[in-house]
Amino acid sequence: MTDKQIKNYFNMTALGFLAYAVLLQILAVIVVVLFSIAFPDLSSDSMYYSMMVAVVPCMLFLHFLFQNSNLPSLRVNPVNIEETGSDSMDLEEKSFSPLVFLHYFLIFCGVQWISSLLTMPLVFLFQKIGMDLSYSEMAAKGGALDNIPMLIYTVLFAPVVEELVFRGIFYKRFKAFGAFFTAFASSLFFALIHSNFLQFIPAFMMGFVLFSIRDRYGLRYSILLHLTNNALAIVVNNLGGSRLWVLSAYGLILLA
């Protein structure tokens, strides 16, 4: 493959991601408007309904855009998959256990703690120069536990779709360039799609953990880890302030 072909391949990938992000926002706005007209009583939850509706066609758009143009491999002497039984970046049948999941979950929590430490100085800096980060903080924390549409989207819908897109479609798009590049590029896109300053560093770092579990054990387990994290984050954000034991338990998890 020539340098020009590789450049065109990456240009196509970047344009596909940009089109996905723009299309997602446009469809979400259209659905919000339609929901507010058809169901005015659901206006407060229209954002979550709109995202549920919008992400599916956007994901299908990416799937059909890239399905016949992904590179199988750039290795000079690729291993015969029939002889080894699996590709080095497609080992979906490795033995998975609750202990393996706990191992990744603790790493995931630790990465969140580290990323929050990295984000705090930037938050302080931007607040000092007068930037209002209240919306970013609210979006990062999620909603209330009694907000059913929020729970469905954040705990179930978003993890499944995001993993299918970033550890599915883009994973396959980049895997010919090696494990590290695939982890970096898919994590970068994953962070960018959140469109939230406070979530960029955490999402980027957590993308590497999600890549690792996906690469070793399969997509279903990165989905499981993602939705478990989202569920725990919402519980801690809602109950951590009023129930000390919740915050203490989460702190022990981070220390582990």
Each language-model region and where it sits:
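N-terminal, membrane-interfacial amphipathic/helix-forming hydrophobic leader that caps
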Residues: M1-F105, C109, W113, R216-Y217, ...
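Primarily residues marking transmembrane-helix entry/exit sites
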Residues: I6, F10-A14, A144, I148, ...
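Alpha-helical transmembrane segments of polytopic integral membrane proteins
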Residues: L24, M59-H63, Q67, S115, ...
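Membrane-spanning helices that line or support transport/gating and their immediate boundary helices
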Residues: I30-L34, L117-L125, L164, R173, ...
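Mid-bilayer segments of alpha-helical transmembrane spans in multi-pass integral membrane proteins
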Residues: C109, W113-L117, P121, L151, ...
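Peri-membrane helix termini and adjoining interfacial loops of integral membrane proteins
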Residues: L125-Y135
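Eukaryotic intrinsically disordered, low-complexity segments enriched for acidic and Ser/Thr/Pro residues
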Residues: E137-A140, M150
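Transmembrane helix-loop-helix hairpins at the membrane interface
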Residues: N147-A256
